Amino acid sequence: MNLYLSFLFIFFWSSAFISGQFIVQSASPFAALCFRFCIVSAFFLIFSIIFKERIRINRNLIFQAMITGILFHGFYLGGVFFSYSMGLTATLSALIVCLQPILTNILSGPILKEKVTITQWIGIFFGFLGTILVIGYDIGTEIPTIGVIASIVALLGATSATIWQKKFTHKISLSVNNFYQALSAG
């Protein structure tokens, strides 16, 4: 089941970032995301039912999953899509939000009491370096300030959601957790 869920997650997740810059040319970023997450939540609900996951869970866990969804999908993807609508390129937005693992590791020690190993830091450094090398950026391009701010909000949303989920919603199955997250973002 985890393999199926992984493919489902990759499909839904990657399609948003890739298609976002094109979508906001024809639709409001937030209307597009609302439509997207209504569809995604329906798919995760169906997936959860097929695999007989327990959908009715403790209200507190539902609340925590929904906060994660608002932070992750609302602020993160909302910030990214809004930055596109303000004229920021997907390239620069990706460079900003790919700082998320670095920021998460910096905050996970004090908040989650986790120790980040030197090996993890090296991996994150090379991942960020690889992103810069693969994506690159044209320094001569004019950069819209509002778009940069929206991408920073997206970065903070993804970081907060990652920490929140690790702290509060790690006991929920992935498909049910994603159902409530997508539902709250829609």
Question: Each predicted region: which residue ranges?
Answer:
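Glycine-/small-residue-enriched transmembrane alpha-helix faces in small-molecule transporters
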Residues: 1-34, 142-167, 185-186
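Cytoplasmic-side transmembrane-helix entry/capping segments in multi-pass membrane proteins
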Residues: 6-7, 60-68, 116-128, 147-148, ...
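Juxtamembrane C-cap of transmembrane helices in multi-pass membrane transport proteins
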Residues: 15-27, 39, 77-88, 96, ...
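Alpha-helical transmembrane segments of compact multi-pass small-molecule transporters, enriched
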Residues: 16, 39-43, 96-110, 125, ...
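Specific transmembrane alpha-helical segments of multi-pass solute transporters/efflux pumps
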Residues: 16-17, 45-97, 105, 133
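Residues that define the loop-to-transmembrane-helix transition and helix capping
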Residues: 30-31, 91, 117, 175
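Hydrophobic transmembrane alpha-helices of multi-pass small-molecule transport proteins
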Residues: 44, 116-136, 155
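Membrane-interface helix caps and helix-loop-helix hairpins in membrane proteins
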Residues: 82-88, 113, 136-144
